[in-house]
Amino acid sequence: MAFDETYNEPESTEVLVKSLDPEHPAQLHYAHAGDAGADLITTVDVTLKPFERALVPTGVAIALPAGYVALVHPRSGLAAKQGVTVLNAPGTVDAGYRGEIKVPLINLDPKHTAVFHPGDRIAQLVIQRYVEARFIPAETLPGSDRAERGFGSTGVAS
């Protein structure tokens, strides 16, 4: 089967975006066609010394439609180049939340301080549909090939 290089437009849904900082209007957008994550920026100066963390405001609040969730993911470039990542990745923004999206960043670089200025991209926001589970109490669970084997159960890469 050959790979189809045709770009298909992804599904879309409307998400209301409220700007909370008049100096930095809400600028949620996708950098490239096909990107899953929209850039989130900081609205304040942030300095993160090695192993320091901070809750960083983005100046953005959103209203998601029912059945959707927004996930705050790290930016791969920040992680690879500066050692900065989202502490609780991915962070969850539920559809009912209307407050400012804030990003808990941590600098995992042991030597270098990371500095961000208003307008710098600090994370990405991915919008996804989700399924709401009906949790059913059970005395026993059906068997599976994996059973109770957990951490490290698939072995170590050679």
From Swiss-Prot:
Required cofactor names: Mg(2+)
Q: Where substrate is bound, by residue? A: 75-77, 88, 92-94, 102
Keyword set, alphabetical order: Hydrolase, Magnesium, Metal-binding, Nucleotide metabolism
Q: Which CDD domains does the protein's record reference?
A: trimeric_dUTPase (cd07557)
Q: Which Pfam families match?
A: dUTPase (PF00692)
Which GO BP terms, alphabetically?
A: dUMP biosynthetic process; dUTP catabolic process
Q: Which family does it belong to?
A: Belongs to the dUTPase family.
What name does this protein carry? Deoxyuridine 5'-triphosphate nucleotidohydrolase
Native organism: Bifidobacterium longum (strain NCC 2705)
State the gene name recorded for this protein.
dut
